[in-house]
């Protein structure tokens, strides 16, 4: 899988704000996602991040993200509609299943927020978990990739010591049919996946 790693990705204002968010308490064996969106027309849907910071994130990150998408999957760039800026807290004893991202994610990104040390996102050769490659945790390090059907298997987990808090930054589309056509996959098969296991696919659409 092709991917990009960038250190010091967020500006100081956004990094300090996101690192100091007061989140609800979760148990050590669960994960919680806070959803925030910025649309290409400027509309905002927010939960835990203020509109001002979301505007700052969009203004300071979008150009770089589009450049990365143009590098990794240039045929998808024209489908962009909105950005996800989701805060994901993973309990110290929780392990998210190995998965590939939903087709509506044109570019998938994660920025490590806190603590100072934890388990990084792990990339695999396949769903079986062969050839694991952990992207080492470093505060304000960003990992980006553009999903494909066969080469974007990954997961994440707590380190058994501290909860893991990240910003998941995705470039998104609602035109899943067009993405399926570009990737050469069966749109009806994707719809069948969602129908047969809607809970998992709704959740995978939210998280990294």
What are these regions (language model features)?
Residues 74-86:
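A short coil-to-beta-strand element that immediately follows conserved catalytic motifs
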Residues 93-94, 103-105, 116-208:
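Catalytic core of Fe(II)/2-oxoglutarate
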Residues 86-102:
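Conserved short histidine dyad/triad with adjacent acidic residue
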Residues 18, 69, 85-87, 121, ...:
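Hydrophobic beta-strand residues in large extracellular and virion-surface proteins
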Residues 1-75:
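Non-heme Fe(II)/2-oxoglutarate
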Residues 109:
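Substrate-binding/active-site groove segments that recognize
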Residues 6-7, 100, 146-147:
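Short His-Asn-centered micro-motif
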């Amino acid at each position: 899988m092709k991917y990009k790693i960038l250190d010091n990705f967020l500006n100081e204002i956004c990094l300090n704000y996101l690192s100091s968010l007061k989140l609800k308490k979760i148990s050590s064996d669960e994960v919680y996602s806070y959803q925030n969106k910025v649309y290409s027309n400027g509309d905002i849907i927010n939960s835990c991040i203020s509109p001002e910071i979301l505007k700052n994130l969009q203004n300071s990150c979008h150009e770089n993200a589009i450049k990365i998408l143009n590098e990794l999957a240039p045929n998808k760039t024209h489908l962009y509609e909105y950005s996800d800026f989701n805060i994901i807290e993973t309990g110290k004893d929780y392990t998210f299943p190995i998965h590939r991202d939903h087709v509506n994610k044109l570019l998938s990104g994660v920025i490590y927020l806190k603590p100072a040390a934890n388990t990084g996102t792990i990339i695999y050769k396949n769903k079986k978990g062969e050839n694991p490659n952990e992207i080492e945790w470093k505060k304000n390090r960003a990992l980006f990739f553009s999903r494909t059907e066969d080469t974007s298997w990954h997961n994440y987990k707590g380190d058994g010591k501290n909860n893991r808090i990240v910003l998941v930054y995705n470039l998104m589309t609602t035109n899943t049919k067009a993405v399926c056509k570009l990737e050469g996959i069966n749109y009806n098969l994707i719809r069948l996946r969602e129908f047969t296991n809607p809970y998992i696919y709704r959740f995978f659409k939210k998280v990294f």
